[in-house]
Amino acid sequence: MNIVDQQTFRDAMSCMGAAVNIITTDGPAGRAGFTASAVCSVTDTPPTLLVCLNRGASVWPVFNENRTLCVNTLSAGQEPLSNLFGGKTPMEHRFAAARWQTGVTGCPQLEEALVSFDCRISQVVSVGTHDILFCAIEAIHRHTTPYGLVWFDRSYHALMRPAC
């Protein structure tokens, strides 16, 4: 059996481009958010996403108790916000750096996000160091910005929507 070491795996994963997202929650355990690229669709019936969250992350207990979240997919130009939510910055400073509205689940929705998916966590599966959060989508908010943001080869890249 061939065992892949951690660094080889991480280097290979850097070749997979992914949307940049800020995942937010608010509820009985408080308000929290983090940057994630490990987000993808599961099914459209019922509309469901998955989000991967390290159980060792400081935000894990908040998401685990609140059981709601909003996936805010970032637009080009929002790299500083991604970096802020991806670091050790206190939560109040993270949220003060942008404009938010409250989604139907009570979670913060980034006003200038490319798209926001307001969700309830319907199932959690633990694998290795992470929990896979299956998220039932309750509402979607799309913005008109033409530029998306992806993380590829350990750096940000802007994408432009084709003209309609």
Curated annotation (Swiss-Prot):
Please list the GO terms describing molecular function.
FMN binding; FMN reductase (NADH) activity; FMN reductase [NAD(P)H] activity; riboflavin reductase (NADPH) activity
Q: Which organism is it from?
A: Escherichia coli (strain 55989 / EAEC)
Family assignment? Belongs to the non-flavoprotein flavin reductase family. RutF subfamily.
UniProt catalytic activity: FMNH2 + NAD(+) = FMN + NADH + 2 H(+)
What keywords appear on the UniProt entry? Flavoprotein, FMN, NAD, Oxidoreductase
Induction note = Up-regulated by the nitrogen regulatory protein C (NtrC also called GlnG) and repressed by RutR.
Q: What does this protein do?
A: Catalyzes the reduction of FMN to FMNH2 which is used to reduce pyrimidine by RutA via the Rut pathway.
For this entry, list what GO says about its biological process: nitrogen utilization; uracil catabolic process
Q: Which SUPFAM superfamilies match?
A: FMN-binding split barrel
Q: Which NCBIfam families match?
A: RutF
Domain of life from the UniProt record: Bacteria
Alphabetized HAMAP family for the sequence? RutF
Q: Name one Pfam family in it.
A: Flavin_Reduct
Query: Where does the signal sequence lie?
Result: none
Please list the coiled coil stretches: none
Q: What is the lineage of its organism?
A: Bacteria, Pseudomonadati, Pseudomonadota, Gammaproteobacteria, Enterobacterales
**EC number(s) for this protein?**
1.5.1.42
Q: What is this protein called?
A: FMN reductase (NADH) RutF
